[in-house]
Curated annotation (Swiss-Prot):
Mg(2+) binds at residues 155, 185, 187. Keywords: Calcium, Magnesium, Metal-binding, Thiamine pyrophosphate, Transferase. Catalyzes the transfer of a two-carbon ketol group from a ketose donor to an aldose acceptor, via a covalent intermediate with the cofactor thiamine pyrophosphate. The active site is at 411 (proton donor). NCBIfam families: tktlase_bact. GO terms for molecular function: metal ion binding; transketolase activity. InterPro entries: THDP-binding, Transketo_C/PFOR_II, Transketolase-like_C_2, Transketolase-like_Pyr-bd, Transketolase_bac-like, Transketolase_BS, Transketolase_CS, Transketolase_fam. Binds 1 Mg(2+) ion per subunit. Can also utilize other divalent metal cations, such as Ca(2+), Mn(2+) and Co(2+). This is Transketolase 1. The lineage of its organism: Bacteria, Pseudomonadati, Pseudomonadota, Gammaproteobacteria, Vibrionales. GO terms for biological process: pentose-phosphate shunt. Homodimer.
C-alpha cells in the first residue's frame, strides 16, 4: 500500500507535468500544499465525486487559485469526471482546466478563484449560508444541514484588504464550520515576503475572534490531521497556520520564487522525480495510488446515509422538507408569477411620487413575504439604502435564523460574501451601498457576472441628485461601467412601477448578477397602459408617443424620464412630433429582437437626444454621432440637488433648446 507521502507526491507529479506541458502555470503552491491536501481530502472532506452537487457536501475553496493544478489533480485522483486528458489540456482553449479554477467548467469547482482574497471571502459566504440554512431548517434529532467549508489561502490572499473585511466578519458571526489553511511559505512573486508582509498573522486572527492553530508542519500528516480535528471541535472559525516549503520536492527551486509562476523545466522535473522517489513517466499514476485516492464508493455511501436522514426528516417535517428542496433547487414559489404581476399592476393603478429607493423598499416588502430565501444586507447604510423591510431579522452569532446581514462598512467583502452565499444555494442574496461605492466592490460583481451567479445589488443615491455630499459621493461613470460588464443586468428605474419590475426580474434571474440603481430624490410616477407595463421587462419601451411618425426621440432613464416627458409636452405643444422612450435597462433592450428594437427606435428617425445624469459618452450607440446627449462630462459639485441639475443642463429649457437646434 502506498505511503501518505507517495499519495501526496501524485499531486506533485501531476502539477509539475501539467504546468510543464502547458508551458505556463504555477507549480510551487500545489507542490507545497500537497501533504495538507492529502490529509484533508482523504481523511476529512465529505464529498461524492459521482454527485458534485450533493447538498450537504463539505465545500472546498482554493483561494490561492493560481495553484489550480492542485485542485485539478485532487478532482482527477478522487474520481470526478476530470480525465488525465483534461489535465494534459491544462490552460488550453475550451478545456475543463483553465489557468485559474472556473466555476462551471470542471465538476467539483465550487467557485472561480484567482483574484486573491476573494476565495476566502466566498468561503465566508458559504459558511454563513450553511449556518443560516441549519438554523432555519434543522430540528432536534434532524441535523440535515451540517457541513464544513474548507479553504486554502496564501500570503497574497492575506495581504489583500478583502481578507480583513471577510475574516473580521467571520469572527464576529462565529462561523465555527469555517476552517482555513494558511500556506505560510514566505514567498510571493517578488521574492521573500518579510520585506512587505511582516504581520503577526496568528495574532491578527486571534483579534478577529478566530481559533488559531500556529506553527503546524505542513509536511507532517499527523500534525495536519491533529490540527483539523482540533479545528472541527472548536465553535469558532479556525485558521490553521501551516509552515510549508513552496515547490516541495524540487531540489534546486523549492523555497524560492523561481518555482512560483513558471514551469520547473524538464531537467528540474527529472531531479524532482528522483528526489521524491516518483519513478513513473509524465501523467502516469499507478493503479494502487488511484485505488487509495478513489473517493467514489465512500462518497456514495456518505450521500446515501444523508439521503436516509433527509427521508426521516421529510416524514417528520414534510412542509419544511419540501421548502428546503425548493430553495436548494433555486425554484420560486408556485404562486410567484401571478402574485408578482398583480403587485406591479396595483402599483400602476395607485400612483405615488416617491424616491425609487423607497419604491425599492416597497417592492421588498411586497415580494419578501413570498420569499423566505431572501438574504438581505447593506454595507452599513440600511437607513439610506432602505434595504430592511418588516420581515427583516438580523443574523447574530448566537441566532442565525434571520434573513438580514449587517455587513458593516465592507462593500467589497459584502459583494464577494454574497457570491459565496449564492454559490452555496438556498438563498437569494441582495446587498446595498451608495452607487458611488460600488467601485470598492467592482471586482466581486465582475466575478458574479463571470460565474453567472445571482447577486442582487441595490445601489442608491444614483447621481448628482444626492446633492450636498458632493463629488466624492456623486456617481458619474459608474452606471456606464456596470452596463459595459458582460452578463451584468443593470436597471435604473424611473418610478415605483419600473422599480418593482426591476426587482421581479432580478429575483427571477438565476444566471447572473443584477445592479438595481435607485434615486435619493422623489420621482413622478408615469401613466402607462397594461401593454406598456408589460414592455418594461424588455428594458426599453415607448412611454409617450407622438401622433403619427415621430421627428424626434427622447431617450431617458431614472430621474431624467420625468424631465424628458415634460420637455416632450412643451415641444408637442409647439407642433413637434416627439416620442419618449424610457430605457431602464439597456442590456435587456439590446437582447430584444431586431423588429422590437426598430419599432421603439426607428432607424430612419435620426434626431435623437439621450438624457441621463451619468457619463454622456455611453449613449452614442443609441443616438449616433448626429444625435445629442445631455449627460455628465465632468465630476459633480457640492450643492443642493436642484441647483446642480440646473447647472449641468438637466432642465426642460435645455432639453427643448437642444431639440430645436437638432431639428433646425
Amino acid at each position: 500500500m502506498p505511503s501518505r507521502k507517495h499519495l501526496a507526491n501524485a499531486i506533485r507529479a501531476l502539477s509539475m507535468d501539467g504546468v510543464q506541458k502547458a508551458n505556463s502555470g504555477h507549480p510551487g503552491a500545489p507542490m507545497g500544499m500537497a501533504d495538507i491536501a492529502e490529509v484533508l481530502w482523504r481523511g476529512h472532506l465529505n464529498h461524492n465525486p459521482s454527485n458534485p452537487e450533493w447538498a450537504d457536501r463539505d465545500r472546498f475553496v482554493l483561494s490561492n487559485g493560481h495553484g489550480s493544478m492542485l485542485i485539478y489533480s485532487l478532482l482527477h485522483l478522487s474520481g470526478y469526471e476530470l480525465s488525465i486528458d483534461d489535465l494534459k489540456n491544462f490552460r488550453q482553449l475550451h478545456s475543463k482546466t483553465p489557468g485559474h479554477p472556473e466555476y462551471g467548467y470542471a465538476p467539483g469547482i465550487e467557485t472561480t478563484t484567482g483574484p486573491l482574497g476573494q476565495g476566502i471571502t466566498n468561503a465566508v459566504g458559504m459558511a454563513m449560508a450553511e449556518k443560516a440554512l441549519a438554523a432555519q431548517f434543522n430540528k432536534p434529532g434532524h441535523d440535515i444541514v451540517d457541513h464544513f467549508t474548507y479553504v486554502f489561502m496564501g500570503d497574497g490572499c492575506l495581504m489583500e484588504g478583502i481578507s480583513h473585511e471577510a475574516c473580521s466578519l467571520a469572527g464576529t458571526l462565529g462561523l465555527g464550520k469555517l476552517i482555513a489553511f494558511w500556506d505560510d511559505n514566505g514567498i510571493s512573486i517578488d521574492g521573500h515576503v518579510e520585506g512587505w508582509f511582516s504581520d503577526d498573522t496568528p495574532k491578527r486572527f486571534e483579534a478577529y475572534g478566530w481559533h488559531v492553530i500556529p506553527a503546524v508542519d505542513g509536511h507532517n500528516a499527523e500534525a495536519i490531521n491533529a490540527a483539523i480535528e482540533a479545528a472541527k471541535a472548536d465553535p469558532r472559525p479556525t485558521l490553521i497556520c501551516t509552515k510549508t516549503i513552496i515547490g516541495f520536492g524540487s531540489p534546486n527551486k523549492s523555497g524560492s520564487h523561481d518555482c512560483h509562476g513558471a514551469p520547473l523545466g524538464a531537467e528540474e522535473i527529472a531531479a524532482a522525480r528522483e528526489f521524491l522517489g516518483w519513478e513513473h513517466p509524465a501523467f502516469e499514476i499507478p493503479a494502487d495510488v488511484y485505488a487509495e485516492w478513489d473517493a467514489k464508493a465512500a462518497g456514495a455511501e456518505k450521500e446515501a446515509a444523508w439521503n436516509a436522514k433527509f427521508d426521516a426528516y421529510a416524514a417528520a417535517y414534510p412542509t419544511e422538507a419540501a421548502e428546503l428542496k425548493r430553495r436548494l433547487n433555486g425554484e420560486l414559489p408556485a404562486e410567484w408569477e401571478e402574485k408578482a404581476n398583480q403587485i406591479i399592476a396595483d402599483l400602476q393603478a395607485n400612483p405615488a411620487n416617491i424616491a425609487s429607493r423607497k419604491a425599492s423598499q416597497n417592492a421588498l416588502e411586497a415580494f419578501g413575504k413570498m420569499l423566505p430565501e431572501f438574504m438581505g444586507g447593506s454595507a452599513d447604510l440600511a437607513p439610506s439604502n432602505l434595504t430592511m423591510w418588516s420581515g427583516s431579522k438580523s443574523l447574530e452569532a448566537n441566532d442565525f435564523s434571520g434573513n438580514y446581514i449587517h455587513y458593516g462598512v465592507r462593500e467589497f467583502g459584502m459583494t464577494a460574501i454574497m457570491n459565496g452565499i449564492a454559490l452555496h444555494g438556498g438563498f437569494v442574496p441582495y446587498g446595498a451601498t451608495f452607487l458611488m461605492f460600488m467601485e470598492y466592490a467592482r471586482n466581486a460583481m465582475r466575478m458574479a457576472a463571470l460565474m453567472k451567479v445571482q447577486n442582487i445589488q441595490v445601489y442608491t443615491h444614483d447621481s448628482i441628485g444626492l446633492g450636498e455630499d458632493g463629488p466624492t459621493h456623486q456617481p458619474v461613470e459608474q452606471i456606464a461601467s456596470l452596463r459595459l460588464t458582460p452578463n451584468m443586468s443593470t436597471w435604473r428605474p424611473c418610478d415605483q412601477v419600473e422599480s418593482a419590475v426591476a426587482w421581479k426580474l432580478a429575483i427571477e434571474r438565476k444566471d447572473g448578477p443584477s445592479a438595481l440603481i435607485f434615486s435619493r430624490q422623489n420621482l413622478a410616477q408615469q401613466p402607462r397602459s397594461a401593454e406598456q407595463v408589460a414592455d418594461i421587462a424588455k428594458g426599453g419601451y415607448i412611454l409617450k408617443d407622438s401622433d403619427g411618425k415621430p421627428e424626434l426621440i427622447l431617450i431617458a432613464t431614472g430621474s431624467e424620464v420625468e424631465l424628458a416627458v415634460k420637455a416632450a409636452e412643451q415641444l408637442t405643444a409647439e407642433g413637434k412630433k416627439v416620442r419618449v422612450v424610457s430605457m431602464p435597462a439597456t442590456d435587456t433592450f439590446d437582447k430584444q429582437d431586431a423588429a422590437y428594437r426598430e419599432a421603439v427606435l426607428p432607424s430612419d428617425v435620426t434626431a435623437r437626444i439621450a438624457i441621463e445624469a451619468g457619463i454622456a459618452d455611453f449613449w452614442y450607440k443609441y443616438v449616433g454621432f448626429d444625435g445629442r446627449i445631455i449627460g455628465m462630462t465632468t465630476f459633480g459639485e457640492s450643492a443642493p440637488a436642484d441647483q446642480l441639475f440646473e447647472m449641468f443642463g438637466f432642465t426642460v429649457e435645455n432639453v427643448v433648446n437642444t431639440a430645436k437646434e437638432l431639428l433646425a
